[in-house]
Design a protein with these regions (language model features):
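Beta-strand-centric surfaces of beta-sandwich/beta-rich domains
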Residues: 1-132
Length: 132
């Protein structure tokens, strides 16, 4: 648990190594996929966002990937954090890529992510924690 964390999309450990939410890149390289909901509705006001991305990359293959973190209702998302570098994030055993952003998030906010990659339909596992 992250100190001061209010809520997360992580539901505990998983036998298949997945954490958080799977986000899929577009079917064509360098195109964004659809928005995936990370948190449907934040339960309280938050002062920051921790983001951890894993599951991107395999040996001897380019796994460059960019991710947008957005807020807003389904179909009306607004990019909050653009082009976050998440490629080569490795497995959950490695630290993957972990970020903290000091952002004010209102109660009731939907938080989502989408990504684009040099590999069509590549995936990433995204964990998010809202901090007090």
């Amino acid at each position: 648990m992250i100190p001061g964390a209010l809520e997360s999309n992580v539901t505990g450990s998983s036998n298949d190594g997945r954490v958080g939410t799977t986000v899929t890149a577009g079917a064509s390289i360098h195109t964004t996929g659809s928005w995936s909901t990370l948190i449907a509705s934040s339960s309280a006001v938050a002062a920051g966002v921790y983001i951890k991305v894993v599951g991107v990359g395999s040996s001897n293959v380019s796994s460059s990937m960019l991710m947008d973190i957005g807020t807003g209702t389904l179909g009306s998302e607004t990019v909050l954090i653009p082009d976050l570098l998440v490629g080569y994030a490795g497995s959950d055993v490695s630290m993957g890529r972990t970020y903290f952003f000091p952002l004010a998030i209102s109660s009731g906010t939907r938080i989502s992510a989408r990504c684009q990659s040099v590999i069509s339909s590549d995936t990433a596992e995204v964990a998010i924690w809202l901090a007090q």
